[in-house]
Amino acid sequence: TGDSLSTATAIAKEIGILEEGHMAIEGKSIDELSDEQLIKEIEKYSVYARVQPEHKVRIVKAWQAKQKVVAMTGDGVNDAPAIKLSHVGIGMGKTGTEVTKSVADVVLVDDSFSTIVDAVEEGRKIYDNIRNDIIYSLSSNFAEMIIVIAGLLMKVEIFLPIHILYIDLATDSIPSICLAFEKSAKGIMKRKPKPVNRPFFTPFIIATLAIS
């Protein structure tokens, strides 16, 4: 924020951003830190006061250097560089300038922060559903493939092409569609964010496929 340190700290405490053990820092103090120092200390701070556009860019870069997924919200022209640099740039639909909205990945039509929370929940649900759908499809098709290969090796025609087509239509299509529209799991928003470098096929998923 461009507000003073005292104002920013008071607001942050009131809305739960500045928790015990976390600190606030001003733009002039950021100027005194090298990029390496800022990266090292960035996780100490939850509030950045009296910051200029160049400070916001350095803050975003520092968090990204920590392998964090960074979302940046803003409505003014001075927010545009950091919004463009972040993983997810979020512009304000009502109060935002055209420049900000043009560089943003997402525009909040209602300017409500709670909409971002809803979007994160929806994104986590979609990720879970895609993962479950892929696990189901791979396990089903892998078993099918083993049977077909076994038949070829034994020179026995176990399935005709029409049989394989029927199995795929009957056992894959409907369950896959149902999995795609599953509701959010309980406690989905209490999960910690996944590491940026975490592979999609984790040991758990590979083990699940093998057992299936």
Language model region names:
Residues G2, S6, L33-E36:
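Signature of the cytosolic headpiece of P-type E1-E2 ATPases
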